[in-house]
Regions:
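Intrinsic disorder/low-structure terminal segments
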Residues: 24-27, 35, 117, 161, ...
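Broad hydrophobic/π-residue packing in well-ordered secondary structure
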Residues: 44, 85, 191-194
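Mixed-charge, glycine-accented linear interaction segment located at domain edges/termini
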Residues: 123-194
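Structured, beta-strand-rich domain cores
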Residues: 62-123
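Solvent-exposed edge beta-strands and adjacent loop segments
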Residues: 2-80, 124-133
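Short polybasic amphipathic segments
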Residues: 22-24, 108, 175-177
Length: 195
């Protein structure tokens, strides 16, 4: 039967650290070519897209939780993915981005303090469901419901072709990102303009 367990589990050593340190937001629908590990389908090895992503450093009280929701009545199981972000300091630029984030749906790469990378909202995306703006910054909650827990990313973010623009933290899969008068554009667009 497919529901039967296949492995036991020992108590691990006390060397893990809780919490998350950064997240990467990708607009929903821009991760269509996902390659899974041939042996372990809970691991994603490749993503071959040129979707723009944005990195948020979230050290401190931010968290990523996956709640198992199961019902005996209708024989269903789903995984509620909850990303709670605590963003320090207010700015007019952040206000603008929070408004956009509140209206959108995203795939989110979550990196914890143990350097595990989770791909949250892979099939259905995460959306802002709650939040607060206060004098010290922002608290934002994003939620999504998936058929499986968030997949682990088998490689590093860098191995997927992410190139981080440190000025604006724009990230581009497979294409370099360049800062141009405060707007992020891909090198291919710049080359078309220059040629």
């Amino acid at each position: 039967m497919a529901c039967d367990l296949t492995l036991g589990r020992k108590e691990p050593c006390k060397k893990v650290v809780g919490g998350i340190k950064e997240v990467y937001f990708v607009s929903f629908g821009n991760l269509t070519n996902v390659g899974y590990d041939s042996v372990d389908t809970d691991v994603i090895n490749t993503i071959s897209e040129s979707a723009l992503a944005y990195r948020y450093e979230v050290r401190g009280s931010s968290s990523f939780t996956q709640n198992i929701q199961t019902s005996r009545q209708n024989s269903s199981t789903s995984f509620e993915q909850v990303l709670e972000l605590s963003l320090k300091k207010l700015s007019k630029e952040d206000n603008r981005e929070i408004k956009k984030m509140s209206s959108g749906r995203f795939h989110v790469f979550v990196i914890d303090y143990n350097n595990n990378i989770f791909v949250a909202g892979l099939d259905n995306g995460l959306q802002v469901t709650d939040g607060n703006i206060f004098t010290g910054g922002y608290k934002i909650t994003l939620k999504g419901e998936e058929r499986t827990p968030a997949n682990f990313l088998g490689n590093s973010i860098d191995s997927l072709g992410f190139i981080v623009n440190l000025s604006e933290d724009g990230v581009q899969f497979m294409e370099r990102v360049q800062l141009d008068n405060g707007e992020i554009v891909s090198i291919s667009c710049v080359n078309k303009i220059n040629n």
